[in-house]
């Protein structure tokens, strides 16, 4: 446990940079506050003794008033110290959590796609939001309290033993017996809190998956099975939360009982000592205050440790994410593309998503500048994988991919990405204006170019029917068809105006009329660009200069449409299966 805590501390240090001074001031304010809390009962003892001795003669009102005024002043100072401590701790912890979120956002951009292949979106989102929030809230509620209470316990112990060791021993022994009992619970709670965070991530991930696929779930009448699976995950979450929260909730009642038990013992033993003339009434009154002061911070420490363990579990998941293997550092790579012609060569490329399963086998092909290259094949043939490798979303295992004779291994990923415009089957639009979506991350794009690209893909008329035209904000109130979303993403790719173009099943999700509209626009705008097209509808790639037919990660046929049809092989069978004999002859 100590090694783990030390590891978490070391991992946290970079995110605490610049906050040390604020934490130091908060620590000093905590010390001042605790000194005042401990010192107060000693003056109350003096006041009690003055009042007790004055019962036989006369009460020294001036002395009592002086002590009362002094106590009022120092308690105001104690209040201000507590306020300062809370303010500084809260500020530092929230700044710490802000930096963690920033680090996670940056980390996501540095993670390879392999990571997301093996982790659900819900689990990743849970680490970004739930785990960071849990850590911040738990630290905010407990860090200052545990520190303050620990210092207070030490100060009270020193003061009590200095005043009367017998009553001090009674207080300490009775309290520590109960505290030892509590520590048994503490040892088991860490695992429960970790399970709670993991089960919460599982529920979030499942809900996100079912929400995004709601139409599919409904169409397959899988609602009942979905509810059953959710019930299992939800019950598991209930079980882990119940265990962690039960242990958390039982701490305070136990510590209150311990405090009351110690309080009663001090009164009984103190009364016996007073009757024997060993202590004054003032000492008993002071110890009655110290018992409360001593047991209360122990209760707070117990609660605080529970919260810190919850924070530790959450931070462990956050730092586990931040420690994931990143993409290769490419700062040393300086090869760039200039005056691009657009020739792309795959030279004996092999790749597998896992070391034990190769997807692409010794893949070789050449796309000459300006050619339209189509990649076809059945599902699982490796078509999309080829595009992922071309874009350097994954690093190839063997062979090379060269753009204008420059090996992409020698280029930064950003340099490769700049060379391509890309349209995916799954459209991505963010909440913002249509104009912002079209010129996404591109500079110096004029309104004229935006309109020209929109007209080229046939979406301009629809945009102008919207109340705010290109300034219409895309959110839940704006309903777009699949085809309209696809046209917007194609217009975005056209505006990028990159020399290389990738269309990954860009027309597979639209109706025939929209497909024809897109195809005409793309045929016209692909002129002069090297284009890679992946499509299940083979009618869209009959005019391709080169068709690569893939099966099980291998190129089994290649040529143009007429050549492949003459071969009467796999491509011809695939083509004829999609069209009637009359259409095929055409």
Protein language model regions, located:
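Membrane-integrated ABC transporters
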Residues: 1-37, 52-67, 85-89, 93, ...
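An intracellular "coupling" helix at the cytosolic face of ABC transporter transmembrane type-1 domains
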Residues: 17-18, 113-114, 132-139, 143, ...
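Alpha-helical segments in transporter systems
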Residues: 21-46, 67, 71, 86-90, ...
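Transmembrane helix-loop-helix hairpins at lipid-water interfaces of multipass membrane proteins
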Residues: 23-81, 161-166, 277-281
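Helix-loop-helix
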Residues: 53-55, 60, 69, 159-173, ...
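Juxtamembrane loop-to-helix connectors within ABC transporter transmembrane domains
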Residues: 89, 93, 109-153
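ABC-type nucleotide-binding domain
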Residues: 330-331, 337-586
């Amino acid at each position: 446990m100590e090694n783990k805590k030390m590891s978490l501390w070391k991992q946290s240090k970079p995110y605490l940079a610049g906050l040390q001074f604020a934490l130091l001031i908060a620590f000093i304010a905590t010390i001042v506050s605790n000194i005042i809390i401990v010192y107060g009962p000693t003056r109350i003892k003096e006041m009690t003794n003055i009042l007790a001795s004055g019962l036989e003669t006369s009460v020294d009102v001036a002395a009592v008033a002086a002590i009362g005024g002094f106590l009022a002043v120092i308690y105001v100072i104690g209040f201000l110290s507590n306020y300062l401590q809370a303010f500084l701790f809260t500020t530092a912890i929230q700044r710490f959590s802000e930096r963690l979120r920033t680090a996670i956002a940056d980390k996501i951009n540095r993670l390879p796609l392999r990571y997301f292949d093996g982790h659900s979106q819900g689990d990743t989102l849970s680490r970004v939001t739930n785990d960071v929030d849990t850590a911040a809230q738990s630290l905010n509620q407990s860090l200052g309290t545990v520190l303050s209470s620990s210092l207070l316990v030490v100060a009270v112990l020193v003061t009590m033993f200095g005043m009367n060791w017998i009553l001090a021993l009674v207080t300490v022994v009775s309290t520590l017996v109960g505290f030892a009992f509590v520590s048994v619970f503490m040892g088991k709670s860490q695992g429960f809190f970790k399970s709670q965070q993991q089960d919460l991530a599982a529920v979030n991930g499942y809900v996100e998956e079912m929400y995004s696929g709601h139409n599919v779930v409904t169409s397959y009448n899988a609602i009942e099975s979905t509810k059953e699976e959710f019930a299992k995950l939800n019950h598991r979450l209930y079980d882990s939360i119940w265990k962690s929260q039960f242990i958390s909730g039982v701490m305070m009642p136990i510590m209150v009982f311990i405090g009351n038990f110690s309080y009663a013992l001090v009164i009984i033993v103190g009364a016996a000592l007073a009757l024997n003339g060993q202590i004054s009434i003032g000492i008993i009154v002071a110890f009655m205050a110290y018992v409360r002061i001593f047991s209360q911070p122990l209760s707070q420490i117990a609660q605080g440790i529970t919260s810190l363990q919850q924070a530790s579990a959450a931070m462990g998941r956050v730092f586990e994410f931040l420690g994931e293997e990143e993409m290769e550092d490419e700062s040393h790579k300086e090869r760039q593309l200039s005056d691009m012609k657009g020739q792309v060569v795959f030279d004996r490329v092999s790749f597998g998503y896992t070391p034990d399963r190769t997807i692409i086998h010794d893949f070789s092909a050449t796309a000459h500048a300006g050619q339209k290259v189509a990649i076809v094949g059945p599902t699982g043939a490796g078509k999309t994988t080829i595009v992922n490798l071309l874009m350097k979303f994954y690093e190839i295992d063997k062979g090379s991919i060269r753009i204008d004779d420059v090996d992409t291994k020698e280029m930064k990923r950003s340099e490769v990405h700049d060379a391509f415009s890309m349209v995916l089957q799954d459209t991505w639009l963010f909440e913002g204006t249509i104009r912002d979506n079209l010129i996404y991350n591109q500079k110096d794009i004029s309104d004229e170019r935006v309109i020209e690209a929109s007209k080229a893909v046939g979406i301009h008329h629809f945009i102008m029917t919207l109340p705010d035209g290109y300034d219409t904000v895309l959110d839940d109130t704006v309903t777009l068809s699949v085809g309209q979303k696809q046209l917007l993403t194609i217009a975005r790719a056209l505006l990028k105006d990159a020399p290389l173009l990738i269309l990954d099943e860009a027309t597979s999700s639209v109706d025939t009329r929209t497909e024809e509209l897109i195809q005409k626009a793309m045929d016209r705008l692909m002129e002069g660009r090297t284009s890679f097209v992946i499509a299940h509808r083979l009618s869209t790639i009959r005019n391709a200069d080169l068709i690569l037919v893939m099966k099980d990660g291998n190129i089994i046929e290649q040529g143009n449409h007429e050549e492949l049809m003459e071969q009467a092989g796999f491509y011809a069978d695939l083509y004829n299966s999609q069209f009637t004999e009359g259409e095929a002859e055409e």
